[in-house]
């Protein structure tokens, strides 16, 4: 817009003024034509040295309005298609009808102005190559569409995320541009209003001069008035107006250069803005702002175009008026000269009078000529004064125009700097939008990652909860085993080992006493008879042999103990392997159970889908059809069952062998009988020996006594430790064998109960009911779990007969078993082991049974899913002092639970039966005292639906 405005004001205005002066005279403005080189475009100035004629070409902007079709939006519509009937069935009922969504484009008629640059002859030049100079030629008017600005295809669009500050700056810049445009229009109007006075004054002066010259025309018969006046006018114009127009042309040239540079920069900015617009997505508010801005720009463009058209019309009218005045003046002068010549040359009747008085007419000729020359001089002086006055006025006008042009140059520079700032701001906004897009993409990826992490955390949370539940069950089993072990240790009788050790010590003391008596008797016999020495020597040898025999027997006992220990370790390993095998078997059973449950759910879901697709009638027809054969033949099933039975028999034989080995080990683990005490013989003969032999014998006896004591201590320690570990291992092995044998018996009974009548099943040739099989296996597994937990719970809690609704004492875990046996659709059982003293609702957080998902452990209440009669039981272990609580039914009925124990605490249990509506809640509140914190807490809450109402 700025480029078109400045170009439309600068180019045609300068060329129009120069053309008007050039048409006034063909010879007087030659220096002006030579001085117009600085106002030509750069390309024209470069070709001046090569082709002198090329400088006569000038560029003219040409505009062309074109109409085009542009895609504005798309519309959706449905396409209906129908499958034709097959051949031979014209009235088929099952016709396949399809609908498909399609899109069609919607076009809009738009108009667009295409601007191009056309080269034409400069004002004052004609010809095919613009080589002829014609001062009378009327300059070709510029195309009326020059002031049109190429309309945008749409409103100005910015990238999303444009800041409000940038919008305010754009509005401020728009207001500044409108203000500058208004000033420029006022200046142009003022200049246009002052120019007609100058043009009107000049023809008036010329007309006055010509009229006075016509009065003296008959004085110069050989010279026309035009030849007399034109040199003077030419000289006057060259002297007074050439410097002014030269400086004016230089100013216009500099202004044109500045406008060209500014137009190039504005075009570059426009292209950059266009690229930003092409890569941006318009928003509603920015579209509205762009539409307003474009409307104002179009309005200003139209005003500038109208102003330019008015200026051109005025210049053209002035030029036409001047040309017509000069033509009329020339015609009038020619007419008068012709009349004068005719008057001088016409013959008359008074020719003699004229000839008679030539001297008398010739005498006043110098005086009249002198008077006429004086009059002409005065007229020229007045014309000079008038011209000087007009020149001063024109000088003032030109100074005003120069100041206006200077101000316009400053404003253009300011606009140029503002356009640079605007471009920088647009670039900054573009970078910010790109950063925002990158941040938005990163934020979206981070959101996706966080969602994935949250899902993973939920899965990990469920896995940890499941593992905690398994660890809790394992801990309960370990605590039960520990209690059983402590009970066994208390019942263990270790007095037999101590008696054996006392017997060994008595034997050692007897041996020592016998040695002392032998030494005394030897002393006595030595004095009495020397022959008794040989008998004593024999007795010592016998004692040595007995001691060696004791040592050998101790070594054999230690070897037997180590061998027994290794056998017990091997048995322990075998028991561990059997336990692992049993765990794997239980794991496989669980997997089969889950597979059966998944298959059952899939079958129910498929049945629902088939019912929705084909209808209940089609499903009933399909169910009434004869069932197809099984994928496996009954012979294969029979062979598989026989293999399973043989495997169970082999496993039973293996368990019998293992029991026999354990029995043998128990018999072998009994402590050996103590060796009989050997008395030395006193019947041997006596022999004499030296004193040195007796001293050596005494030392050997002392060392033998020490060795016997050491062996006794070692045997005592090893026998005690080995017996304790052996008893513990044997007890654990007995328990493991008993549990495994019972599990095998239960599996065998279950197997025979399920597949005992497989011959009848083969003869019936019907499919197995997987749902019934799954239900049977579930019930057997639950009974097995109840049987496994019964011994441990029997050791801890004992059931008491309920005389009243309110009783005291622990409650066994028979409630869950009763629920499993009854097959109630709604049942729950939960416990609370953390302990609390807050007077609020107790949240039983450990849930063992929750059939129907009606109990919410996070809130601690049960919500009835159906209307019916429910049975509830709550057992609370209160802390020291009195404790009180209440079982709340729907907020309107309360059943108290209290205890008055003053000791270390007591347990209170309450049973209640109530009819609940659907959605009513039941919970337990602590109103006084505290609840004891225990790992195996007796604080529990349970209930189930007895029947619906």
From Swiss-Prot:
Matching PROSITE patterns: C1Q, EMI
Region feature Disordered, mapped onto this chain: 133-157, 779-801
GO molecular function terms listed in the Swiss-Prot or TrEMBL record: receptor ligand activity
A Pfam family this chain is assigned to: C1q
UniProt cross-references to InterPro entries, sorted A to Z: C1q_dom, Collagen/C1q_domain, EMI_domain, Tumour_necrosis_fac-like_dom
Glycan attachment residues as annotated in the record: 63, 67, 115, 205, 214, 249, 261, 350, 379, 439, 472, 727, 765, 845
Tissue: Endothelium.
Gene Ontology cellular-component annotations: basement membrane; collagen-containing extracellular matrix; extracellular exosome; extracellular space; multimerin complex
Subcellular location: Secreted, Extracellular space, Extracellular matrix
Domain EMI stretches: 54-132
Domain C1q: 821-949
One of the GO BP terms on file: negative regulation of cell population proliferation
Comp. bias regions, Basic and acidic residues: 784-800
Coiled-coil intervals: 167-187, 292-487, 547-596, 688-711
Keyword terms: Angiogenesis, Coiled coil, Disulfide bond, Extracellular matrix, Glycoprotein, Secreted, Signal
Signal sequence segment: 1-22
Major location (coarse): secreted
Modification note: N- and O-glycosylated.
Disulfide bonds: 58-122, 85-92, 121-130
Assembly and binders: Heteromer of p110, p125, p140 and p200 subunits; disulfide-linked. Interacts with VEGFA. Interacts with CD93; this interaction promotes angiogenesis. Interacts with CD248.
Role this protein plays: Extracellular matrix protein that plays significant roles in the vascular system and is required for the maintenance and stability of blood vessel. Affects several essential steps in angiogenesis including endothelial cell proliferation, migration, and tube formation. Positively regulates angiogenesis by acting as a ligand for CD93 receptor.
Protein name per Swiss-Prot or TrEMBL: Multimerin-2
Organism: Homo sapiens
Gene field: MMRN2
């Amino acid at each position: 817009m700025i480029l078109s405005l400045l170009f439309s004001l600068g180019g045609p205005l300068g060329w129009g003024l120069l053309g008007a002066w050039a048409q006034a005279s063909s010879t007087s403005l030659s220096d002006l034509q030579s001085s117009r080189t600085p106002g030509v475009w750069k390309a024209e100035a470069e070709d001046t040295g090569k082709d002198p004629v090329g400088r006569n070409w000038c560029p003219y902007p040409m505009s062309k309005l074109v109409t085009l079709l542009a895609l504005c939006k798309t519309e959706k519509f449905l396409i209906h298609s129908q499958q034709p009937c097959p051949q031979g069935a014209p009235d088929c009922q099952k016709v396949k009808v399809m609908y498909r969504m399609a899109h069609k484009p919607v076009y809009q008629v738009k108009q667009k102005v295409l601007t191009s640059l056309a080269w034409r002859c400069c004002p004052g030049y004609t010809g095919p190559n613009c080589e002829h100079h014609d001062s009378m030629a009327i300059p070709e008017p510029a195309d009326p569409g020059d002031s049109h600005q190429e309309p945008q295809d749409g409103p100005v669009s910015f990238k999303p995320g444009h800041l409000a500050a940038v919008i305010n700056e754009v509005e401020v810049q728009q207001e500044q541009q409108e203000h500058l445009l208004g000033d420029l229009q006022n200046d142009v109007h003022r200049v246009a209003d002052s120019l007609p006075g100058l043009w009107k004054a000049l023809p008036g002066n010329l007309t006055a001069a010509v009229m006075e010259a016509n009065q003296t025309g008959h004085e110069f018969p050989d010279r026309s008035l035009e030849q007399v006046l034109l040199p003077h006018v030419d000289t006057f114009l060259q002297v007074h107006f050439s410097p002014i127009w030269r400086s004016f042309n230089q100013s216009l040239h500099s202004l044109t250069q500045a406008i060209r540079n500014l137009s190039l920069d504005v075009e570059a900015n426009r292209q950059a803005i266009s690229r930003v617009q092409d890569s941006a997505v318009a928003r509603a508010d920015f579209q509205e702002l762009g539409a307003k801005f474009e409307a104002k720009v179009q309005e200003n463009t139209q005003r500038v175009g109208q102003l330019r058209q008015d200026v051109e019309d005025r210049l053209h009218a002035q030029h036409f008026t001047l040309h017509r005045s000069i033509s009329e003046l020339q015609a009038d002068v020619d007419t008068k000269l012709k009349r004068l010549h005719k008057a001088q040359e016409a013959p008359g009747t008074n020719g003699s009078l004229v000839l008679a008085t030539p001297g008398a007419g010739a005498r006043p000729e110098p005086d009249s000529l002198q008077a006429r020359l004086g009059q002409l001089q005065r007229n020229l002086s007045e014309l000079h004064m008038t011209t000087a006055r007009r020149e001063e006025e024109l000088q003032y006008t030109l100074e005003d125009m120069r100041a206006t042009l200077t101000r316009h140059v400053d404003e253009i520079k300011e606009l140029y700097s503002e356009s640079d700032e605007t471009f920088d701001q647009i670039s900054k906004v573009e970078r910010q939008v790109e950063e925002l897009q990158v941040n938005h993409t990163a934020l979206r990826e981070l959101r996706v990652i966080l969602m994935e992490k949250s899902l993973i955390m939920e899965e990990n949370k469920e896995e940890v909860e499941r593992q905690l539940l398994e660890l809790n069950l394992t801990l309960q089993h370990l605590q039960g085993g520990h209690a059983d072990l402590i009970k066994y240790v208390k019942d263990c009788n270790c007095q037999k080992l101590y008696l054996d050790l006392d017997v060994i010590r008595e034997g050692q003391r007897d041996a020592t006493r016998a040695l002392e008596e032998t030494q005394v008797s030897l002393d006595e016999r030595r004095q009495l008879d020397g022959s008794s020495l040989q008998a004593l020597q024999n007795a010592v040898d016998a004692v040595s042999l007995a001691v060696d025999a004791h040592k050998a027997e101790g070594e054999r006992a230690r070897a037997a103990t180590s061998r027994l220990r290794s056998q017990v370790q091997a048995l322990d390993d075998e028991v561990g392997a059997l336990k692992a095998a049993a765990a794997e078997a239980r794991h496989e059973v669980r997997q089969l159970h889950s597979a059966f449950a998944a298959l059952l759910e899939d079958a129910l879901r498929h049945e629902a889908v088939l019912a929705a697709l084909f209808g209940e009638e089609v499903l009933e027809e399909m169910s009434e059809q004869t069932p197809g054969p099984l994928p496996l033949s009954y012979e294969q099933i029979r062979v598989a069952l026989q293999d399973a039975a043989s495997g169970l028999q082999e496993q039973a034989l293996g368990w019998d062998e293992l029991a026999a080995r354990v029995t043998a080990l128990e018999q072998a683990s009994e402590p050996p009988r103590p060796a009989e005490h050997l008395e030395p013989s006193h019947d041997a003969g006596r022999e004499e020996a030296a004193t040195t032999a007796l001293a050596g014998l005494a030392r050997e006896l002392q060392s033998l006594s020490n060795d016997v004591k050491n062996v006794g201590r070692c045997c005592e320690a090893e026998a005690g430790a080995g017996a304790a570990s052996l008893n513990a291992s044997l007890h654990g092995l007995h328990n493991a064998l008993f549990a495994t044998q019972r599990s095998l018996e239960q599996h065998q009974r279950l197997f025979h109960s399920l597949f005992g009548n497989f011959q009848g099943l083969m003869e019936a040739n019907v499919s197995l009911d997987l749902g019934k099989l799954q239900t049977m296996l579930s019930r057997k597994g639950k009974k097995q779990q109840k049987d496994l937990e019964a011994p441990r719970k029997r050791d801890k809690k004992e059931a008491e007969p309920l005389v009243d609704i309110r009783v005291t004492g622990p409650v066994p875990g028979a409630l869950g078993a009763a629920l499993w046996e009854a097959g109630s659709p709604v049942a729950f059982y939960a416990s609370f082991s953390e302990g609390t003293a807050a007077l609020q609702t107790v949240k039983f957080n450990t849930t063992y049974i929750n059939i129907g998902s009606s109990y919410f452990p996070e809130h601690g209440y049960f919500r009835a899913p159906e209307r019916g009669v429910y049975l509830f039981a709550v057992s609370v272990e209160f802390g020291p002092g009195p404790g009180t609580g209440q079982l709340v039914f729907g907020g309107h009925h309360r059943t108290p639970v209290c205890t008055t124990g003053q000791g270390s605490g007591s347990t209170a249990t309450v049973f209640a039966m109530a009819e609940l509506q659907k959605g009513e809640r039941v919970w337990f509140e602590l109103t006084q005292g505290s609840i004891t914190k225990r790992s195996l807490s007796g604080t529990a809450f349970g209930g189930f639906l007895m029947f619906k109402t």
